[in-house]
Amino acid sequence: MSVTVFNPRIDDAAASDITAVTPVITALNELSSAQAPVEKAATKKVFVTTQGCQMNVYDSGKMLDVLGDSHGMEVTHNIDEADVLLMNTCSIREKAQEKVFSELGRWRKLKEKRPDLVIGVGGCVASQEGDNIQKRAPYVDMVFGPQTLHRLPELYDQSHQQREIAPKNRIGTVDVSFPSIEKFDFLPEPRVEGFKAFVSIMEGCSKYCSFCVVPYTRGEELSRPLDDVLAEIDSLAAQGVREINLLGQNVNGYRGEKDDGSICRFAELLHYVSHVDGVERIRYTTSHPLEFTDDIIDAYAQLPELVSHLHLPVQSGSNAILAAMKRNHTIDVYINQINKLKAIRPDIHLSSDFIIGFPGETDQDFQDTLNLAKELNFDHSYSFIYSKRPGTPAAELPDDVSFKTKKERLAEFQKVIIDSTLAKTHEMVGTTTRVLVEQVANRHPDCLIGTADNTRTVMFPYDVDKMDEMLGKIVSVRITDFVSPHMVKGEIEAVLA
């Protein structure tokens, strides 16, 4: 998945940072009244393309924030008018590196036409490849990792200095180190438009699943201090955000330090967030079954702000494959967790991640995965054919499942999930659901659109003259019609918050 992030977060004050300033003449009375006015320097524009997970979407927003705060840059939708091109990369899938270099090849043509264009590569591929990116693509000016994106202004300045010193033999700047979680100390105050926001509460992962590159590209788990997380959420809520999505590679493994030095675990954090004025809905991703503890499950009984949707990756329905993946839990443990949650929230909607065709996966292993999907009736899933990732333990295993078999199994599995998605959306008709109202429908100007707890888009008619006052409200909508697998239509019943 590749998403271009257009998030204009730059305030007017930041734009003044790059205004040309009239030289100061210290000798009094020497300033000529006839002095010609100095024109403002043109505002630089930045274009960001984002691959991969929601953590990357969050990071891309922060890239825009830091460059706006430091250099007054503005985001652009048009790559042809950009002064800076940033690619935030993902290395989860096979051939991720080649996709990056393919896109960079297209960007090279732009730079040939505009030599002053600055190109930067960030994210997990940048962490993996490091200075190899500039060896293969010497026209790249900046390479930075997820933990060093706060240093973008410095890297940008260094790239300009390199041009001035050695325009023909320029050496780009590379910073893919794993400092502590310091980047959050250097990021500007969060700015957002809309009623939803991501908040990163931790970085990295220490689970070391055999197939996964995340511990190698984002480092070990590091949790942000509790006060820092709550301060960011307070700021977002003050800007009108109603839904907070807590992010982390292993988000429910959060262990943030409190003022007194004690540790705040994830379930306790959920309670703190629920008490922030203005926050009406809480989501989180991505979770690990090992950290999905009873106190988190109990929170679903205690906190109405927690949406009735859970994304809990399981990866396979076979205990043998889970062991090979080093997931360190069994299917029985996973099913027991889900059953406990359903006892508390019968209307909970589940989604998960699945890897099909992992090395050693037999027909029975795959059948176990199909059986799990049918038993738990997942709402949707992110399912992929296994991709060998260099440097991971699984890459050393014999890849003994043919590509043809992998494709056939994936198609069969995805049909089970698609059928479940369709059935669950149809089941919404005649029920009432909670919706965050977000915008006027583009194609139906007499209707408002919002998101239900279960991630479905909900459209409902409303008085055109009063639509603005409904934006950002939490409403109850009775569903009347199925529109598509991920969209329904209904009638508003009440304003809840």
Curated annotation (Swiss-Prot):
Residues binding [4Fe-4S] cluster 1: C53, C90, C124
A GO term for molecular function: metal ion binding
Keyword Lipid biosynthesis: no
SUPFAM superfamilies: Radical SAM enzymes
Record-given protein name: tRNA-2-methylthio-N(6)-dimethylallyladenosine synthase
Classification via Pfam families: Radical_SAM, TRAM, UPF0004
Annotated S-S bridges: none
GO CC annotation: cytosol
Cofactor stoichiometry and binding remark: Binds 2 [4Fe-4S] clusters. One cluster is coordinated with 3 cysteines and an exchangeable S-adenosyl-L-methionine.
Domain MTTase N-terminal: 44-161
Family annotation (Gene3D superfamilies): Methylthiotransferase, N-terminal domain, tm_1862 like domain
Segments forming domain Radical SAM core: 191-423
Main location: cytoplasm
Assembly, per entry: Monomer.
Entry similarity comment: Belongs to the methylthiotransferase family. MiaB subfamily.
Key words, A-Z: 4Fe-4S, Cytoplasm, Iron, Iron-sulfur, Metal-binding, S-adenosyl-L-methionine, Transferase, tRNA processing
Positions contributing to [4Fe-4S] cluster 2 binding: C205, C209, C212
InterPro entries: Elp3/MiaA/NifB-like_rSAM, Methylthiotransferase, Methylthiotransferase_CS, Methylthiotransferase_N, Methylthiotransferase_N_sf, MiaB_methiolase, rSAM, rSAM_horseshoe
Gene name tied to this protein: miaB
Cofactor(s) required, per the database record: [4Fe-4S] cluster
Superkingdom of origin organism: Bacteria
Organism taxonomic ancestry: Bacteria, Pseudomonadati, Pseudomonadota, Gammaproteobacteria, Moraxellales
Role according to the record: Catalyzes the methylthiolation of N6-(dimethylallyl)adenosine (i(6)A), leading to the formation of 2-methylthio-N6-(dimethylallyl)adenosine (ms(2)i(6)A) at position 37 in tRNAs that read codons beginning with uridine.
Catalytic activity line of the entry: N(6)-dimethylallyladenosine(37) in tRNA + (sulfur carrier)-SH + AH2 + 2 S-adenosyl-L-methionine = 2-methylsulfanyl-N(6)-dimethylallyladenosine(37) in tRNA + (sulfur carrier)-H + 5'-deoxyadenosine + L-methionine + A + S-adenosyl-L-homocysteine + 2 H(+)
All copies of domain TRAM, residue ranges: 426-494
EC nos: 2.8.4.3
Keyword Secreted on entry: no
Subcellular location: Cytoplasm
